[in-house]
């Protein structure tokens, strides 16, 4: 290699204390890929590949032999490259605790606080918490905590998981588990857990009852032998080392800037084949579409990691991590501290720990990355030092950003930030607007302002002497300074006319490029931030009494309440920094014990340790191949040819599986909903939607398959094809619909025309729209197909429909059903997305494995999954409604179009669900025309509460429209039109059940008519009167949800040692199915035991779903699978009890194990299979609930903070209150995402473009209600239901519309404040989702200008 580089040596790392040499590893290998393919570790998961979800978080430890110090930090293993980790130690969730060595306190507490459902996110969650604990405990300046606690504060505990995504739990129990370690927490405030019984007089919260925590030192993250090896290698290096160290194949580690440049001069590579890396976090934003041959690791160049402080300021080396920069700047002056505060909201902690300051700025300069850091440092007057070859120069950051994009030879050495000291004349503020307050989201706009000013003695306002105004992320190539505005402001005394003119000038400066999303909103944000800044320098602007104009650094939802507000209203605090509080109320029953007990979810500790096995955790069989979809990007076109952009990609491809590879006698079928229709597996011969599967690339590794699929070049032709139908409007124009079978069609009620004739008031052609929602299960679609003898095949699939998957795969291959075996142990989140859509992956794997006669595995990358998934149905509704002057509704008619996509899937089922949820109110007469539109987009499918979520919201939109028209309180309209039992029976028929079970009126009155609600509503009104730029709203929403009971099988087998194996048709997808089934098994067999069966729970194992073992398994969905599975198991147990009773009676009261031994000796059959079917007269029932939500809207930015949500849900006699509580909270938060911030966007061809964690934002810990209260009530007994229980999985999602309704009330208050904001101040259409841009638009994009104009006019 020449004198510039040594011979390559293998990368040496330790994983959980075990030493590994990475020999023959591709240089582009990530740590996650290495862990999952070269070690036994399976805890870290691939959730996104972007550093945006936290599923892959590990702890990395580095040893400084000179200082004899170990530093450790959390990191995203999906982004961290293995080649950069030579002589590092890696600790995963298995490494801190496991089933053999004992679980760690973090793992046990996550389990005990019921904080793990599907469990796919839990190992990463575990490591984020562990890392935060270890970091706090290492801080010597903090006081020692009481025994059992850590040095972590409760606020830090919450933020520890702010970058980790969870789609199941709603975060509240995770936050409680985190806070249980904090010394400043009140344990009584923590939620339901397995360690003490809340509210019990004899069971007080006590740290001694929690799993013991003794500090981070209990886990050795860096083994001594590796320290010795490092010291030894240093000794060898001192004896004469080559200029540049080399590890692996193609990794170079220069130690100086000179060595870096000599590498380029040595002709070892060309610039196009080399990648410069320090942390590689940028690849989460800009995914490499090809692999690089060479990598230069600049993180070991000492000069680039130096930090120099002086009286002039601080110079930060380019490879200093963001977290280190925050630490350094936090210890400086006022400007430095505000910069640090802003930086703390950039990315998650596990990205901040590795991402570098220089890397962020380089991305802004080269790739137009919307950097917060560049904007803030630009405003602070920063300079950068760069070096090209032998030439080093220091230029302003502004100059650097304006230069042509840097090439690979240009090295950013450092960034210098001047020290502005403690001059009272200096004001520095920074702002950002993003969907997540704590930062795990790119800004819509970021800005930073620095002014030198003096106070004018006569007016009290500031005279601006000099000013810097920086704006970024608004749609320009890079952050800019608003020079024209700066020049205008210099020498001006800040006043309303001056601010108004500055704002007008700014609108000509901040100009988003064509194609930028929400351009008007971004300009309005920039105006709002300049207004906030300048208002802080002004005096005498007319404000309401007690008003507070929000200003300050990083105002993500900054809220200042009225001074007269009560503490419960959180007055005078920043609402984004409020601690999350909660309350849970429920009734526990011993009647059917252990059924009804809030026991921990089965397998939760295994999930936390990473030992729970998902499909992609199954070890790859010998000769396994890997697949990735090539999908169409055109909605309607002939596929002419498939090629690959690079020769490397084509070299890695073994074959491409297409429709021609389906076996003779097989069908091109990817999914099939019984009696409704099929969907093709492969394009043949015409692509019918963007995202359709053209073929499957097969390669030797999953990475090569991904790479080749991304490099695929498709030749299209649209000759002789009609233009695509993409929208509901297109479908209506072309009369393109799917039929709804008569047996699925909902039934109208009454005479609408007669009802309208009786109305005092009418609304004609009201309209509302609802967009789609992506499932965002943490585990993407995955399958492993293993061919077997005699044309048989076994597939491990993450599926909610194993039986239908088996049938479809068999049809696709042209073989009998019994030749196909589908095995599903657990699913990493489903929500309906692992129903029909999972079948495509299974069938594609099966075709490939069948043809190649080798195992084939597929694990979809997040982008492909999002593009192909389909998601929730978009809908457009027009309605006409008549009502009396007192608010009583006489009749409703609505026309609804839903976008079903290219195939029926489950779409024809949705009309009855839409109408079912909408019928929660007595509409008098109800008629409708529902069209299921056939379009050239991916098929929409069932997503949690399909149709019901939309139908319930449509009802609320109509009711709010009525209330607005009559100028009355919306709750009065709601209450007046709730059913009595007679009308309920008319609208719902047999589902209404008995009068005693109708609890909705009681629930609604409990909330909406309570004195507390009236007081809170008055306080909201008081707050709004005293605050111009913050408005609050409060709303109470009732729900009704009709669920269906389905036949379900169950099998119970008692082993000779007394252990019990149980099989059910349902699949464990995180909903607690296994836990409830175990409880039911113990209860049903309990009459054979002295303790009533409680001792049997630990003897029960529920085993994986297997279609050859458990036929007629049905499907997991519709919220009732758990209860019907329990009933099937109870039926099986009843037969076993009858057989065992004679043995028990003959032997007296033998212990369980002895009883089974005697039965076995007597040849008693110890297994029983049952197939439970519901009573034909009771196949469905209604679920009821209500929720009050209170929100605060920032009129200037559109940001919404959910201050409080109170949920009351009728759970019947809960089979497991802890599981049901988790379902209620998780569904509610998923609903918050649907109604407020999950923006599902497509391009002009219908291709999904919000296709990753960077652009699609599900709720996070910082976006859930600050006060989150849930009460589960037990309604009247109904023994027609399973032990009087009720469903909990889907209905509570509908309650989240209360947040949307509260937002509407807050916006209405803003529109009253600024009358005439684009129309009537009271009546307006607010579609779903109500994202920040939508909220701001409804509040008024020009409220600042209109306010200033009105103020100036008064003056």
Swiss-Prot record:
InterPro entries in UniProt: 2Fe-2S-bd (IPR002888), 2Fe-2S-bd_dom_sf (IPR036884), 2Fe-2S_ferredoxin-like_sf (IPR036010), 2Fe-2S_ferredoxin-type (IPR001041), 2Fe2S_fd_BS (IPR006058), Ald_Oxase/Xan_DH_a/b (IPR000674), Ald_Oxase/Xan_DH_a/b_sf (IPR036856), Ald_Oxase/xanthine_DH-like (IPR016208)
Q: Does the keyword Cytoplasm apply?
A: no
Tell me which EC number(s) this protein carries.
1.2.3.1
A biological process from GO: abscisic acid biosynthetic process
Q: Which Pfam families match?
A: Ald_Xan_dh_C (PF01315), CO_deh_flav_C (PF03450), FAD_binding_5 (PF00941), Fer2 (PF00111), Fer2_2 (PF01799), MoCoBD_1 (PF02738), MoCoBD_2 (PF20256)
Reaction catalyzed? an aldehyde + O2 + H2O = a carboxylate + H2O2 + H(+)
Q: What does this protein's record comment on cofactor binding? A: Binds 2 [2Fe-2S] clusters. Binds 1 Mo-molybdopterin (Mo-MPT) cofactor per subunit.
Binding, [2Fe-2S] cluster: 48, 53, 56, 78
What SUPFAM superfamilies does the annotation carry?
2Fe-2S ferredoxin-like, CO dehydrogenase flavoprotein C-terminal domain-like, CO dehydrogenase ISP C-domain like, CO dehydrogenase molybdoprotein N-domain-like, FAD-binding/transporter-associated domain-like, Molybdenum cofactor-binding domain
PROSITE patterns membership: 2FE2S_FER_1, 2FE2S_FER_2, FAD_PCMH
Q: Where is the FAD-binding PCMH-type domain?
A: 244-422
**Which family is annotated?**
Belongs to the xanthine dehydrogenase family.
**UniProt keyword terms in alphabetical order:** 2Fe-2S, Abscisic acid biosynthesis, Auxin biosynthesis, FAD, Flavoprotein, Iron, Iron-sulfur, Metal-binding, Molybdenum, NAD, Oxidoreductase
**Name under which the protein is recorded:** Probable aldehyde oxidase 2
Q: Where is this region: Disordered?
A: 544-577
Q: Where is the 2Fe-2S ferredoxin-type domain?
A: 9-96
**Example GO molecular function term?**
aldehyde oxidase activity
Q: Which organism is it from?
A: Oryza sativa subsp. japonica
- Obligatory cofactor(s): [2Fe-2S] cluster; FAD; Mo-molybdopterin
């Amino acid at each position: 290699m020449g004198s510039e580089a040594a011979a390559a040596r293998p990368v040496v790392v330790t994983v959980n204390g075990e030493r590994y040499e990475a020999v023959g590893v591709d240089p582009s290998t990530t740590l996650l890929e290495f862990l999952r393919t070269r070690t036994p570790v399976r805890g870290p998961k691939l959730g996104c590949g972007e550093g945006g979800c936290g599923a892959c978080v590990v702890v990395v430890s580095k040893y400084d032999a000179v200082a004899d110090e170990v530093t450790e930090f959390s990191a995203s293993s999906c982004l961290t490259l293995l080649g950069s980790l030579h002589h590092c130690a890696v600790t995963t969730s298995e490494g801190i605790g496991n089933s053999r060595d004992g679980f760690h306190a973090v793992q046990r507490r996550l389990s005990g606080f019921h904080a793990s459902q599907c469990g796919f996110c839990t190992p990463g969650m575990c490591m984020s918490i562990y890392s935060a604990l270890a970091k706090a405990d290492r801080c010597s300046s903090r006081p020692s905590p009481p025994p059992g606690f850590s040095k972590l504060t409760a606020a830090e505990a919450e933020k520890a998981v702010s970058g980790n995504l969870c789609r199941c739990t709603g975060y509240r129990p995770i936050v409680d588990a985190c806070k249980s370690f904090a010394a400043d927490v009140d344990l009584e405030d923590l939620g339901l857990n397995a360690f003490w019984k809340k509210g019990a007089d004899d069971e007080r919260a006590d740290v001694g009852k929690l799993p013991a925590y003794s500090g981070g030192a209990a886990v050795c993250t860096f083994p001594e032998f590796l320290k010795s090896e490092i010291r030894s290698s240093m000794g060898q290096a001192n004896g004469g080392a080559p200029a540049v160290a080399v590890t692996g194949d193609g990794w170079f580690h220069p130690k100086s800037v000179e060595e870096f440049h000599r590498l380029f001069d040595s002709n070892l590579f060309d610039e196009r084949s080399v990648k410069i890396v320090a942390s590689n976090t940028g690849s989460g934003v800009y995914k490499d579409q090809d692999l690089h041959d060479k990598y230069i690791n600049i993180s070991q160049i000492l000069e680039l990691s130096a930090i120099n402080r002086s009286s002039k300021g601080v110079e930060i080396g380019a490879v200093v991590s963001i977290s280190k920069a925050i630490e350094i700047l936090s210890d400086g002056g006022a400007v430095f501290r505000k910069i640090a505060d802003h930086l703390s909201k950039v990315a998650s902690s596990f990205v901040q720990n590795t991402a570098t300051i220089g890397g962020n700025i380089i991305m802004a300069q080269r790739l137009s990355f919307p950097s917060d850091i560049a904007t803030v440092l630009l405003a602070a007057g920063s300079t950068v030092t760069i070096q090209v070859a032998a030439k080093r120069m220091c230029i302003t950051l502004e100059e650097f950003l304006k230069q042509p994009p840097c090439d690979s030879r240009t090295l950013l050495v450092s960034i210098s930030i001047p020290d502005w000291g403690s001059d009272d004349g200096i004001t520095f503020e920074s702002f950002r607007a993003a969907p997540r307050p704590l930062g795990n989201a790119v800004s819509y706009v970021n800005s930073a302002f620095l002014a030198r000013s003096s106070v004018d003695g006569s007016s009290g306002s500031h005279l601006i002497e000099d000013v810097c105004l920086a704006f970024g992320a608004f749609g320009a190539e890079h952050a800019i300074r608003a020079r024209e505005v700066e020049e205008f402001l210099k020498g001006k005394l800040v006043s309303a006319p001056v601010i108004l003119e500055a704002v007008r000038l700014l609108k000509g400066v901040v100009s988003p490029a064509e194609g930028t999303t929400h351009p008007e909103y971004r300009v309005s944000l920039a105006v709002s931030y300049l207004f906030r800044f300048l208002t802080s320098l002004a005096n005498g602007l007319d404000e309401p009494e007690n008003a507070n104009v929000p200003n300050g650094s990083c105002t993500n939802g900054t809220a200042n309440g009225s001074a007269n507000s009560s503490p419960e209203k959180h007055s005078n605090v920043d609402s984004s920094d409020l601690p999350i509080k909660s309350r849970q109320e429920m009734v526990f029953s011993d009647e059917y014990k252990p059924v009804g007990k809030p026991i921990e979810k089965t397998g939760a500790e295994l999930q936390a340790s990473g030992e729970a096995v998902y499909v992609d955790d199954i070890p790859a069989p010998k000769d396994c191949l890997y697949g990735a979809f090539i999908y169409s990007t055109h909605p309607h076109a002939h596929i002419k040819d498939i090629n690959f952009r690079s020769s490397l990609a084509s070299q890695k491809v073994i074959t491409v599986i297409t429709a021609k590879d389906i076996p003779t006698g097989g069908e091109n079928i990817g999914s099939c909903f019984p009696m409704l229709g099929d969907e093709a597996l492969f394009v043949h011969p015409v692509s019918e939607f963007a995202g359709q599967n053209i073929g499957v690339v097969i390669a030797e590794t999953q990475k090569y398959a991904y790479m080749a699929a991304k490099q695929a070049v498709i030749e299209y032709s649209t000759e002789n094809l009609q233009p695509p139908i993409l929208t509901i409007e297109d479908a209506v124009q072309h009369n393109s619909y799917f039929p709804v079978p008569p047996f699925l069609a909902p039934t109208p009620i009454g005479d609408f025309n007669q009802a309208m004739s009786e109305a005092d008031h009418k609304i004609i052609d009201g309209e509302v729209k609802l967009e789609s929602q992506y499932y965002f299960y943490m585990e993407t679609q995955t399958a492993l197909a293993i061919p077997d003898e005699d044309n048989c095949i076994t597939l491990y699939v993450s599926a909610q429909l194993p039986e239908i998957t088996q049938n479809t795969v068999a049809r696709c291959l042209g073989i009998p059903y019994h030749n196909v075996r589908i095995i599903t142990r657990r699913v990493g989140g489903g929500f309906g997305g692992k129903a029909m859509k999972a079948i495509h992956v299974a069938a594609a794997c099966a075709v490939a494995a069948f043809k190649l006669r080798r195992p084939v595995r597929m694990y979809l990358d997040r982008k492909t999954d999002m593009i192909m998934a389909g998601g929730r149905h978009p809908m457009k509704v027009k309605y006409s409604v008549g009502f009396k002057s007192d608010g009583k509704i006489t009749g409703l008619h609505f026309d609804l179009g839903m976008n079903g996509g290219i195939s029926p899937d489950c779409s024809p089922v949705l009309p009855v669900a839409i109408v079912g949820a909408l019928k929660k109110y007595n509409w008098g007469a109800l008629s409708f025309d529902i069209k299921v539109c056939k379009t050239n987009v991916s098929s929409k499918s069932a997503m949690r509460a399909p149709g019901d979520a939309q139908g319930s919201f449509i009802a609320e939109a109509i009711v709010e429209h009525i209330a607005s028209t009559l100028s009355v309180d919306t709750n009065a309209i709601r209450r007046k039109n709730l059913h009595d039992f007679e009308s309920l029976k008319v609208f719902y028929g047999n589902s209404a059940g008995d009068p005693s079970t109708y609890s909705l009126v009681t629930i609604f009155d409990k909330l909406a008519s309570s004195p507390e609600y009236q007081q809170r509503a008055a306080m909201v009104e008081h707050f709004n009167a005293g605050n111009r730029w913050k408005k609050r709203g409060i709303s109470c929403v009732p729900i009704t949800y009709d669920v269906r009971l389905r036949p379900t099988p169950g099998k119970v087998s008692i082993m000779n040692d007394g252990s019990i194996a149980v099989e059910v048709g349902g699949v464990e997808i995180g909903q607690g199915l296994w836990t409830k089934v175990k409880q039911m098994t113990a209860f049903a067999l309990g009459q054979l035991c002295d303790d009533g069966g409680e001792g049997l729970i630990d003897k029960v194992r529920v085993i994986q779903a297997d279609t050859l073992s458990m036929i007629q398994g049905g499907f997991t969905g519709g919220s009732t699978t758990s209860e019907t599975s329990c009933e099937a198991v109870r039926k099986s147990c009843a037969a076993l009890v009858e057989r065992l009773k004679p043995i028990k009676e003959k032997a007296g009261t033998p212990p369980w194990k002895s009883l089974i031994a005697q039965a076995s000796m007597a040849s008693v059959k110890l297994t029983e299979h049952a197939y439970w079917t519901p009573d034909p007269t009771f196949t469905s029932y209604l679920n009821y609930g209500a929720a009050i939500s209170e929100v605060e809207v920032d009129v200037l930015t559109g940001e919404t903070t959910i201050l409080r949500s109170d949920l009351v849900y009728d759970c019947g006699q809960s089979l497991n209150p802890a599981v049901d509580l988790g379902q209620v909270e998780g569904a509610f938060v998923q609903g918050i995402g649907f109604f407020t911030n999950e923006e599902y966007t497509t391009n002009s061809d219908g291709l999904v473009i919000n296709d990753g964690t960077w652009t699609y934002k599900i709720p996070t810990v910082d976006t859930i209600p600050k006060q989150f209260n849930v009460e589960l009530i037990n309604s009247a007994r109904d023994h027609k239901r399973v032990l009087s229980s009720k469903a909990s999985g889907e209905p509570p999602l509908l309650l989240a519309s209360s947040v949307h309704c509260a937002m509407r009330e807050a916006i209405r208050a803003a529109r009253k404040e600024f009358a005439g904001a684009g129309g009537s101040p009271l009546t307006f259409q607010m579609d779903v989702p109500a994202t920040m841009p939508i909220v701001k638009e409804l509040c008024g994009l020009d409220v600042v200008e209109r306010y200033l104009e009105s103020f100036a006019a008064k003056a």
